[in-house]
Amino acid sequence: MRNVKGGVWKNTEDEILKVAIMKYGLNQWARISSLLTRKSPAQCKARWHEWLDPSIKKTEWSKEEEEKLLHLAKIFPSQWKTIAPLVGRTASQCLERYNRLLDEVQRQQDNENGGGSGGGGTTTTTTTTTGENDPRRLRMGDIDPTPETKPAKPDPIDMDEDEKETLSEAKARLSNTQGKKEKRKFREKQLEEARRLAFLQKKRELKAAGINYNPKKKGKEKSWDISKEIPFYLKPKAGFYDVPDEELRDEPNKDASFIGKRVDQIENPNYLQRQEKLNKLEDIKKSKKEIFNLPQLISETSKSNDVEHSIKRTKLQLPEPQLTDDDIQEISDYEKLNGSGSGGGSGGVGVGEFPLPAPRTASISSTAANNNTNNIRTPMKQDTIMSEAQNLLALSNAQTPLKGGAGPNVSQTPLPKSVNNSTPFRTPNPLANQTPTQHNKKQSLNDSNEFAIEDKFKRQQGKNQLLSNLKNLPSPTIEYKLELPSELPTIEDDTTLELDNSEIHIREQQQLKHKEQFKLRNRSTVLKRNLPRSRNLFPINKNNNNNNNNNINQDELRILKEINRIISHDNKTFPNDSITPSSTFDDDDDDDNHHHHHDDIDNNSINDNDEKYENYDYFTNTELEFADKLIRDEIEQIKQELKQPLPSSNEILEEIDQIRSQFIYLPKENQFIEKSNANQTQLIENLQFEYDKTLNKIKNSSMKSVNLEKKLNIYNGGYQNRSNTIIKNIDDMFDQLEQSEIEYQCFVALKNNESIQMEKRLKSIENQVYDQCEIESRLQQKYAQLLNEKNLLKKKLSIF
């Protein structure tokens, strides 16, 4: 079966084409197409230049681009390859957009001719014919003539065998680095490397033989290196004057301090440091205020977040009225006096009527005249794109000019701004646009008076015609009156506005925050200062209510009731679940549990008395300050009555400790009694409670110590391991030091022994040398004696 090339491009084919272009470039299309069995070289080239090239613009067409396209299509008809680079699009994109614009104009003309709607409005160029009415939509069985300009078809989950084979072959070829060309390149690279190594070996051998071989410098000893020195250059001598400015100007590194710096470093280098310092100071002030003056910080925050202090929407600021109330009143009176059918004339004022002033009457008449005329409107902007497309459609449908007759009706459109005007700018000629002046009287053939009389007659005739036309105008059907409203419209408050969910949520969060701040602001001073809380309510004797004669008891009763009300309110608003009653008044022996043991409250006793103290009064800051002032004044009065200084804090604490030691706590009865009035059973009960309490403290302390030990092991585990390693290294180094010290002492002793034995060995060697010298001298003498005897014997033998 013959393989027909072409068709829709697939995603795998696009990817293969991209990789092949990366390897083979943009000129070897035959080699690139050999990787794609279903595509020809021309199709591969068209696919790259029409779709895959990253420089192709695929966004929506702008108005300027459409104007430029239509203008260039009129100048270069059917020359899309020439128009495409000027517009910044591909040729197929330009042709497709041009045809769509013509189709849009044709559709509008068909609707107008067919009586369709759309005569009152203008259609924009962004609307395109879609659906079944699009003439370029592919039907069933149609073949896309330009598949290179369409998006790629996605890869199926199950690919065909042919596609898999093409993909595997392309992978193998594109990843092949062992072909003939690659082998030849590798062989050439190896030969070049071998040549370089041989040259280095030769140079090394020549250098070892004392010959400096440098082929680059051969034949260049007598020439100048212009990059390093200047021929025949003589350094100028120092003159009589200093030239620091010229040296600074010619300095190559004069801008080194400027290069590489940011704008903030040049303009204001310390701005960031100052800003950071100010932020740190602001944070420190805020943290100090949180520690030392928390109520003030809470009050300031609540004031800033309060709904009353929030920024309200400002009222509408209108300009001052041109007519005052008196002017409007005069106009309304004038309308009432003249009646509805007077027509606004200036005559006919009845008895008791007063005439309107002349200037104001003139202004009213002029206003009425202006109201009768049509209002000035902004002229509608012409759709240049659609008009240009209509012109091109008319030109394309026009008959040949050889037949003669009138040409197509083409409207003039201004040149778009995106197209450069080829006409050069010239100096304007002011005389060319002036009205021609009248000829000189000496050169005129007729008298000027005749023309003046004729012009005057024409002006009078036109004036009379205008007056007659004005008289024939119909009577007005609509009359306008100016009346003041009886009631001014009320400005709606911001609360009537409908809020969205986000604004409702924000306001709910603000209300919750204000409530929480209100609770914190109205808590007792005991909780504000984090002091020990009361365990239970103070007992009140009901017999005191009947004792009206004793004012002191009544005052104490009121104070106790108020204290119980405050305790009940604090326990309900800020509850504390960890309740363990104590046998003593305080637990100063344990600072960590100081507040926790004092926060113990008997819930049962409090809940029973909640109904008595439900009505809790909230006081303002002014009332609280006034009460505090009264208490301070009373304290000062007591000081003056005592006429002696108040006891010190240590004396007060000693007195309190002495009083506390006289009382014991009974957990079953939940009260304190004097130790002198307690029996044996109550003492045992108190001691048992103290024992249990101490045992609980020990358990809690042990658990805390275990947890702290675990945390310390986590935090200090690495340091402990490192310290153990360092200690081990120190021990090893100390052992080495001891071993080195022992070896040193051994070598010192060995040196001393060697120095002593060396003298003995030297003496023995010297003695041996002396003995050897004596032996040699004796042997030399013996040798000389024997040599003489030999010579004598030779002489004797020679005689015989």
Curated annotation (Swiss-Prot):
The organism's place on the tree of life at top rank: Eukaryota
Subcellular location per the Swiss-Prot or TrEMBL entry: Nucleus; Cytoplasm
Region entry Disordered, spans: 109-186, 334-378, 399-445, 571-610
GO biological process: DNA repair; mRNA splicing, via spliceosome
Known function: DNA-binding protein involved in cell cycle control. May act as a transcription activator. Plays a role in pre-mRNA splicing as core component of precatalytic, catalytic and postcatalytic spliceosomal complexes. May also play a role in the response to DNA damage (DDR).
Family of this protein: Belongs to the CEF1 family.
Subunit structure: Component of the precatalytic, catalytic and postcatalytic spliceosome complexes.
Entry protein name: Cell division cycle 5-like protein
Lineage of the organism: Eukaryota, Amoebozoa, Evosea, Eumycetozoa, Dictyostelia
Originating gene: cdc5l
